[in-house]
């Protein structure tokens, strides 16, 4: 700030500021709009920049987003690199070593190549960082009781602070703009994002200066509002000015967060959503035995045409291989644990979400102080489980609507640790699936998680049920209860059902069948998540944006190829003890033909007549009704007609009698004896 003609008393710099309302900063995404799990580990780099937006200091760590708030300790002179000319470092690039020559101690000749005596007084016209002597005097200023420095916010300041100016005034054009620093009046703020102070005590700084090093380190700490802000990826700026007599020199600096581990970007081009729809690969034929090492005389060995040292990347599995591997893995796991159910059955893939379901289990997780490798892997964080059964271990603030899934709820774990789920399990959180949890995220958010086993939504049907669905005239009174793979195998990794089927937990997890199912689920989940990502970034028609259509297209692709039989909304594969049958549609036709022949062989000639002549059945059912009605009329019609005629005659006679009665009067009868007696 420009100094007035008279001296600046301390009270001029302690003007009371107007009361400010606390700004509520919402937990929304600023510079980065991410939809991944909050527990996902990223490579985070906090950078301190100079006025030219060049990075002069940085610190890197692997942590979840918005959970790592380290102390930033750049040197004050580092902020002046490529800065204003009065700092003396305008021609030195970032990350330059401290310029010399060193500072003399008492006698100028005591240090070889020294420039000035360390005890000479500092003037306001001297550069601040270009020599060891200037850096030592700068340390004296920043630690002096009546001097120091103050910091003013730039880009994120409120509207009333427009009078604070811009970068040309280091955002400190008027008093009251300062929010932090190391000054006598102790500037503070309830809304600024950082606090700035010295990182070395007054006795420590001169020693570092005399050794020709950076000796004015600052310590920048994030405040509560700063930790709630999520706009650090775009960066924020501040201005810093020294509080000395005369003109207050200053500079500007910025702080930003760089996130370098966001995964690959999808270029604009052909939509890759449906590019992997390929038929299943044919089984590899058995290779012939290798020829003997002996070669005919004079016949030199032919060198191989290909380079055996060149690694070949295996092609990505298409729709056919991916879904068939998923059903094959389900069959192997079911056949190993319960062989009686795989004598003859149908395993069906559903076309409607959810495609996976979870079984809550109890297990012991492992706690790590540093992020393990699987915590930084981009697991299925876009996928959520809408169907979870059972009771298991829960973490976080579980709402009442989901407490039925918790057999044991652990309180919130303090500290900054990483909780890794046991092998074969995942954490099903309100934000998605993840193999690793961050206790910092659980403490800062309302996220909650349940330890679950993940099983594909594969429906088990007995063969009799499937055949009757394709046979005409056979209907169940009610729909049978569908058994899924989760109900048949749920809890195996934690030993829940394994003890009942006589299979140890360790043995099951280590078996090749279970590993094959886990690998198939991982590949399918990866494909589904990639489909979601591609659909989110797709620039084509909106008809591709429905995930259900994607899985429906996959199953339709298998159905049209004859690989599965369509049963309602499911795509079913036939399986028995010989294994999974790929040509399931042909197998279904074969089984239906066998059942039809067996049914016909047990029928009589009359029943067979109806089966062999479908038109006869239609004709009889059409004319049978009218014939029966006509026969009834011929049998009972005359009798009914006679009774009706007799009834009509009787009624007519009664009417005639009534009419005659009304026309004539009845004469009174006279007894002759009574007449004679009167006379």
Curated annotation (Swiss-Prot):
Top-level taxon of origin: Eukaryota
Biased composition (Pro residues): 280-293, 301-314
Segments for region (Disordered): 268-321
Pfam name, any one: TLV_coat
Name the record gives this protein: Retrovirus-related Env polyprotein from Fv-4 locus
InterPro entries: FMuLV_rcpt-bd, TLV/ENV_coat_polyprotein
């Amino acid at each position: 700030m420009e100094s007035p003609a008279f001296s600046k008393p301390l009270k001029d710099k302690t003007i009371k500021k107007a009361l400010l309302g606390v700004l509520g900063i919402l937990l929304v995404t600023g510079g980065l709009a991410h939809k991944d799990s909050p527990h996902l580990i990223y490579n985070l780099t906090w950078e301190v920049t100079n006025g030219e937006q060049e990075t002069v200091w940085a610190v890197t760590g692997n942590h979840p987003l918005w959970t790592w708030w380290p102390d930033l300790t750049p040197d004050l002179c580092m902020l002046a690199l490529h800065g204003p000319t009065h700092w003396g470092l305008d021609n030195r690039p970032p990350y330059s070593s401290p310029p010399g020559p060193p500072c003399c101690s008492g006698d100028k000749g005591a240090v070889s190549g020294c420039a000035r005596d360390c005890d000479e007084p500092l003037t306001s016209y001297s550069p601040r960082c270009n020599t060891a002597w200037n850096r030592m005097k700068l340390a004296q200023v920043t630690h002096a009781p009546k001097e120091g420095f103050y910091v003013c916010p730039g880009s994120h300041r409120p509207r009333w602070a427009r009078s604070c100016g811009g970068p040309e005034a280091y955002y400190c054009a008027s008093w009251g703009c300062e929010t932090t620093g190391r000054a006598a009046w102790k500037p503070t703020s309830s809304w600024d994002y950082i606090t700035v102070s010295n990182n070395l005590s007054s006795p420590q700084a001169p020693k570092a200066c005399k050794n020709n090093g950076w000796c004015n380190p600052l310590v920048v700490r994030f405040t509560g509002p700063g930790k709630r802000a999520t706009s650090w990826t775009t960066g924020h700026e501040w201005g810093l000015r020294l509080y000395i007599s005369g003109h207050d020199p200053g500079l500007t600096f910025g702080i930003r967060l760089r996130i370098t581990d966001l995964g690959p970007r999808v270029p604009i081009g052909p939509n890759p959503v449906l590019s992997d729809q390929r038929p299943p690969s044919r089984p590899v034929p058995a290779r012939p035995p290798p020829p003997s090492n002996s070669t005919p005389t004079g016949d030199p060995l032919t060198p191989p045409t290909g380079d055996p040292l060149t690694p070949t990347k295996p092609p990505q599995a298409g729709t056919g291989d991916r879904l068939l591997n998923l059903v094959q893995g389900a069959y192997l796991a079911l056949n190993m644990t319960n062989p009686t159910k795989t004598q003859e059955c149908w395993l069906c893939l559903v076309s409607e979400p959810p495609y996976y379901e979870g079984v809550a289990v109890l297990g012991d997780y492992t706690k790590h102080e540093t992020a393990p490798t699987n915590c930084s892997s981009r697991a299925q964080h876009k996928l959520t489980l809408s169907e979870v059964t059972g009771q298991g271990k829960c973490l976080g603030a579980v709402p009442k609507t989901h407490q039925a899934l918790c057999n044991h709820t652990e309180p919130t774990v303090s500290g900054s640790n990483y909780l890794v789920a046991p092998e074969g399990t995942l954490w099903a959180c309100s934000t998605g699936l993840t193999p690793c949890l961050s206790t910092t995220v659980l403490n800062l958010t309302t996220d909650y998680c349940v330890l679950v086993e993940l099983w594909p939504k594969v429906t088990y049907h007995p063969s009799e049920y499937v055949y009757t669905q394709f046979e005409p005239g056979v209907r169940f009174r009610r729909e049978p209860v569908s058994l899924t793979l989760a109900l048949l195998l749920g809890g195996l990794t934690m030993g829940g059902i394994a003890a009942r089927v006589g299979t140890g937990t360790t043995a099951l997890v280590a078996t090749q069948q279970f590993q094959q199912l886990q690998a198939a689920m991982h590949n399918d989940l990866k494909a589904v998540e990639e489909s979601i990502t591609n659909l989110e970034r797709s620039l084509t028609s909106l008809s591709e944006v429905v995930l259900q259509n994607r899985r429906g297209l996959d199953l339709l692709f298998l159905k049209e190829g004859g690989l599965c039989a369509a049963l309602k909304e499911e795509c079913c594969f036939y399986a028995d003890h010989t294994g999974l049958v790929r040509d399931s549609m042909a197998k279904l036709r074969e089984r239906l033909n066998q059942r039809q022949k067996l049914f016909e062989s047990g029928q009589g000639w009359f029943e067979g007549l109806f089966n062999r002549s479908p038109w006869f059945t239609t004709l009889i059912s059409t004319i049978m009704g009218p014939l029966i009605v006509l026969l009834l009329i011929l049998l009972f019609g005359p009798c009914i007609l006679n009774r009706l005629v007799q009834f009509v005659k009787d009624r007519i006679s009664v009417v005639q009698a009534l009419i005659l009665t009304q026309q004539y009067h009845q004469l009174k009868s006279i007894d002759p004896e009574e007449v004679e007696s009167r006379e």
